[in-house]
Amino acid sequence: MTSSYKDSSLKVFSLNSNPELANEIATHIGTNLGKCTVSKFSDGEVQINLEESVRGCDVYVVQSTCAPVNQHIMELLIMIDALKRASAKSINIVMPYYGYARQDRKARSREPIAAKLVADLIEKAGANRVITLDLHAPQIQGFFDIPIDHLQGVPILSSYFEQKNLDDVIVVSPDHGGVTRARKMADRLKAPIGIIDKRRPKPNVAEIMNIIGNIEGKTAILIDDIIDTAGTITLAANALIENGAKEVYACCTHPVLSGPAIERIDNSKIKELVITDSIPLPDEKFSTKITALSVAPLIGEAIIRVHEMQSVSILFD
């Protein structure tokens, strides 16, 4: 960016979930990260100290609520309270990954809707806006009574695959719920789509049932919003190869990659897994199959547009 916001009323702060991404976002905007200290009392309570004035400022707080999820949520809520009491003009939450998004409805009797609870907590604490990326369930936007800017990772992922110039591509959704996402990528790549029909007998366990679409001899690109234990995506990749696909790539916006995920990916038929840095990838989760793309330019541009009262939808329409 040629513009500089270093001396403006726009301030960007980072908490502990993804400081590298926050720093890249600030660099894209043309400013420095705001100064604050996040520490703990001996019993684990979170303590936050703002080390510069935010009075009258439009503040953007970067915090993905990834693991440890509850710790990062409490940091965020306490930061919002600190900013509110310090007379910030507006408190804007930049949450690339929205934790608890998979608990967006009552799948069974007597279950909570935790995604709604998190929304209530953020709003009640004093946030004025949320900027997020590829919510697991887009209807979570309706859990808030404040503005939500819902960015999409498909343009970033699609651009990467366009530059690879792959032959005879088919974009595949690993389940019926991801068809809309797969179609958006397929439209950008001018490719057909396929769907994997699966049954999930219990959480984090998936069974491949049927492949819808002609994949014989094609280069398949699996796309999902979240890869957690990688059971679904690796079973899907193996099934695609067994049914005639030439090679399989996979991509996702949010690389949770918990438990046996890396081992499964390394041992699978996936040639390359393309992710974004909405969730930081620690060294112990490194794999030669993984390529990480930055969402900092997208989020940075969204922040600028919000601050300048410009349209954000142009970033993904």
UniProtKB/Swiss-Prot annotation:
One of its GO terms (cellular component) is cytoplasm. Keywords: ATP-binding, Cytoplasm, Kinase, Magnesium, Metal-binding, Nucleotide biosynthesis, Nucleotide-binding, Transferase. Mg(2+) 2 binds at residue 175. Mg(2+) 1 binds at residue 136. One of its GO terms (biological process) is purine nucleotide biosynthetic process. Belongs to the ribose-phosphate pyrophosphokinase family. Class I subfamily. It is found in: Cytoplasm. InterPro entries: PRib_PP_synth_CS, Pribosyltran_N, PRibTrfase_dom, PRTase-like, Rib-P_diPkinase, Rib-P_diPkinase_bac. SUPFAM superfamilies: PRTase-like. One of its GO terms (molecular function) is ribose phosphate diphosphokinase activity. ATP binds at residues 43-45, 102-103. Binds 2 Mg(2+) ions per subunit. This is Ribose-phosphate pyrophosphokinase. Pathway: Metabolic intermediate biosynthesis; 5-phospho-alpha-D-ribose 1-diphosphate biosynthesis; 5-phospho-alpha-D-ribose 1-diphosphate from D-ribose 5-phosphate (route I): step 1/1. D-ribose 5-phosphate binds at residues 200, 224, 228-232. The gene is prs. It comes from Oceanobacillus iheyensis (strain DSM 14371 / CIP 107618 / JCM 11309 / KCTC 3954 / HTE831).
